[in-house]
C-alpha cells in the first residue's frame, strides 16, 4: 500500500537511544521461532473437519449453526425470520446476495408479505443507523470464518457499516464454506497479502464471536448488552 511515512528515523532513533545502543539499519533478520503454534494449529484439517471444529465451538458461544445448500438457503433464512418474529430487517448491500439467489427475496418477496426490509444505502449514513437501531434482524455475509473460535470476520465497506452487525436484536451471518479457515492467522495473512497487492484496507474490521456475552466478577452471564441477543450462522 503506497503512502508517506513521516518522522520514522527520529522515532526509531529515540527508541534505540532508550535501549542504550545505536540504531540497527542493516543485517537485521527475523528470528526463527522454536514453536509456530499459530501456523500449526488445525493446519492439516480438511474443509469438513474444520466445519466440525467450527460447529462444536459454536455450541460454546450460544450460536445456532444451520447447514444448508445454495438452493435451500432462502427457505432456511425465511424459516428463521419467522421463528424470530419477522422484521424489520436490515440487509447489507452485497453482490453475494445476487450470487446466492437472494436479491429478489429481500427486495420483493418479503416486502410483499408485509415484512419490512431495508437495504444498507452508502449514501444515507444517518438513515442506515436508524434502520439498524430499529431492526429486529441484521443479515450479512462473513468475509472470513475462524473455525477455532467460531468467529466471523466482517469488513466495513460502502454496502455495510458497523451498526448493521451490532444494533439489530438478532444477527444472521451467511457463511460460504470457502471462507472457513483454521484460525485468525490465515485470515490476517490473506488480508495482508491483499494490502500488499494494493487493495485498500477496510476502515473497520470486526471479529464477531456469537451473540453479545458479558459477565461480571461473579461470573453471571448477561447476553445482549453490547450486541445482538441471538446469532445464527448459515453455512452454505
UniProtKB/Swiss-Prot annotation:
Q: Pfam families under this entry?
A: LUD_dom
Q: Which domain of life is it from?
A: Bacteria
| InterPro entries named among the record's database cross-references | FTHF_cligase-like_sf, LUD_dom, LutC, NagB/RpiA_transferase-like
GO process annotations (BP)? lactate metabolic process
Q: Which family does it belong to?
A: Belongs to the LutC/YkgG family.
Q: What does this protein do?
A: Is involved in L-lactate degradation and allows cells to grow with lactate as the sole carbon source.
Which PANTHER family does this entry report, sorted A to Z? LACTATE UTILIZATION PROTEIN C
What is the name of the protein in this document?
Answer: Lactate utilization protein C
Origin species, per record, is Bacillus cytotoxicus (strain DSM 22905 / CIP 110041 / 391-98 / NVH 391-98)
Amino acid at each position: 500500500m503506497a503512502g508517506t511515512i513521516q518522522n520514522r528515523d527520529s522515532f526509531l532513533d529515540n527508541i534505540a537511544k532508550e535501549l542504550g545502543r545505536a540504531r540497527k539499519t542493516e543485517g537485521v533478520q527475523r528470528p526463527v521461532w522454536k514453536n509456530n503454534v499459530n501456523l500449526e494449529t488445525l493446519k492439516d484439517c480438511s474443509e469438513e473437519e474444520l466445519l466440525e471444529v467450527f460447529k462444536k465451538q459454536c455450541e460454546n458461544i450460544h450460536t445456532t449453526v444451520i447447514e444448508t445448500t445454495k438452493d435451500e438457503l432462502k427457505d432456511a433464512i425465511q424459516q428463521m425470520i419467522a421463528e424470530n418474529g419477522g422484521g424489520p430487517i436490515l440487509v447489507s448491500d452485497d453482490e453475494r446476495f445476487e450470487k446466492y439467489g437472494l436479491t429478489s427475496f429481500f427486495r420483493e418477496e418479503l416486502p410483499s408479505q408485509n415484512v419490512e426490509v431495508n437495504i444498507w444505502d452508502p449514501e444515507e449514513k444517518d438513515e442506515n443507523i436508524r434502520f439498524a437501531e430499529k431492526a429486529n434482524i441484521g443479515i450479512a455475509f462473513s468475509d472470513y470464518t475462524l473455525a477455532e473460535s467460531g468467529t466471523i470476520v466482517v469488513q466495513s465497506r460502502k454496502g455495510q457499516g458497523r451498526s448493521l452487525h451490532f444494533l439489530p436484536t438478532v444477527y444472521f451471518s451467511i457463511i460460504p464454506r470457502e471462507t472457513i479457515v483454521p484460525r485468525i492467522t490465515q485470515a490476517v495473512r490473506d488480508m495482508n497479502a491483499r494490502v500488499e497487492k494494493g487493495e485498500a484496507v477496510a476502515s473497520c474490521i470486526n471479529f464477531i464471536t456469537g451473540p453479545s456475552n458479558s459477565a461480571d466478577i461473579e461470573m453471571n452471564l448477561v447476553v445482549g448488552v453490547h450486541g445482538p441477543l441471538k446469532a445464527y450462522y448459515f453455512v452454505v
